[in-house]
């Protein structure tokens, strides 16, 4: 067909393109979901058991999408001793829109001012919770294209998930993840193995430009999420089976071939149901299911149709039970951030990846295939996979990325819990002020984590000014350094002390390529 390569053609790409480094940011305070149940007057366990949520992170009016992304980017650059001139592409995935024209990416360029690096491609990508994954694919495609200049790509996924008072509010959260993409990575994107499904649906959307709150069709949203998973998994299985056949292996792909399986997580219970859903797909596709012990007791469901089972409690219960061991082995650990911080929209699935990397050693991760299901309402979804490098030696890229996340649980534990009424007051404050001009935020600066960027003011022309809460390493800085405003050329951010040049030319050498709340 037009545009396709001949079967005998060889394409060349940089070697092992993938995730080189990962940084995650979440706010310094949370509300306990058990306490929120009491405050909301609902049955005990509705949020903690029914949704599977323990705590929900939130931010005051001191933080917005720009400050979240500035924080996670600068943290990644500093923790990895990177120079700002080693970034050649920067793209943001978000659905938290505070300006209909100016991108979050352009705000992030303030961090690059001192380096003088303005030659950075990419802008923002938006489709509910899928924008981060679309940005990741764009980054990979850039590195594997003739446009690549040998530098890293940086992807930022971040959101503030807030809901009006009611059943959906406990499925909120806040967070941002930054992913450094490049060759010779410890987490490698498997080429040709993406199963994508896109369709038109009004399951979750935000048409009101004056409100942060979405319009949600809860039942439709659950159906859309699960049906997209069915479609994506089916396409992925066909593609990897075709690859295996070329290698002389005719076995069918199943859940057992994933070392880990992570999901976009609006709430933890949906993720558990989703893994069970994948087992249902395996069951229906297995011509020898009677000989497989994992399907023992499921014989009665041999003739069900996938499209008839989205709300079938008997099917759901049976396959959740049958997949319980698989869930414990492959998915449960990925829910650390989701359970403790809530839904982070575009960054949710990458928070799940961070959770896995934080809880397993390089030796336990080496060689594993990580399945990744990304979903965004409206809708767009992809199931793809990462292959972990085999090199788990001390000082290896895999050792470095896991070491950088080893403090994830302690960081979550270091947050401050606040009473539900204080949380509600903050939500009301956001609702009343997020669109105001000539506004100075009321939230405490001292309560923020050190190194957090925050909103100083919004002027009469809606222009936003930010500052960074000092870190111990900032003691020698002059007072006022760290205050940035896009219209003041003299204000800047100090770059990391250690300068790292662009990727060496050798790295670019090619190698022959043979919910009831809305699940967005």
UniProtKB/Swiss-Prot annotation:
Phosphoserine is found on 4, 495, 516
Q: Where is this region: Disordered?
A: 492-520
- CDD domains per record: init_cond_enzymes
Q: Give the pathway listed in the UniProt entry for this protein.
A: Metabolic intermediate biosynthesis; (R)-mevalonate biosynthesis; (R)-mevalonate from acetyl-CoA: step 2/3
EC code(s) of this entry:
2.3.3.10
Q: Which UniProt keywords apply?
A: Acetylation, Cholesterol biosynthesis, Cholesterol metabolism, Cytoplasm, Lipid biosynthesis, Lipid metabolism, Phosphoprotein, Steroid biosynthesis, Steroid metabolism, Sterol biosynthesis, Sterol metabolism, Transferase
| List of residues binding (3S)-3-hydroxy-3-methylglutaryl-CoA | 43-44, 129, 167, 171, 221, 264, 273, 343, 377
Q: Which residues form the active site?
A: 95 (proton donor/acceptor), 129 (acyl-thioester intermediate), 264 (proton donor/acceptor)
- State the reactions this protein catalyses: acetoacetyl-CoA + acetyl-CoA + H2O = (3S)-3-hydroxy-3-methylglutaryl-CoA + CoA + H(+)
Query: Where in the cell?
Result: Cytoplasm
Oligomeric and partner information: Homodimer.
What NCBIfam families does the record tag this protein with? HMG-CoA-S_euk
**Function description:** Catalyzes the condensation of acetyl-CoA with acetoacetyl-CoA to form HMG-CoA, which is converted by HMG-CoA reductase (HMGCR) into mevalonate, a precursor for cholesterol synthesis.
What this protein is called in its record is Hydroxymethylglutaryl-CoA synthase, cytoplasmic
Lineage of the native species? Eukaryota, Metazoa, Chordata, Craniata, Vertebrata
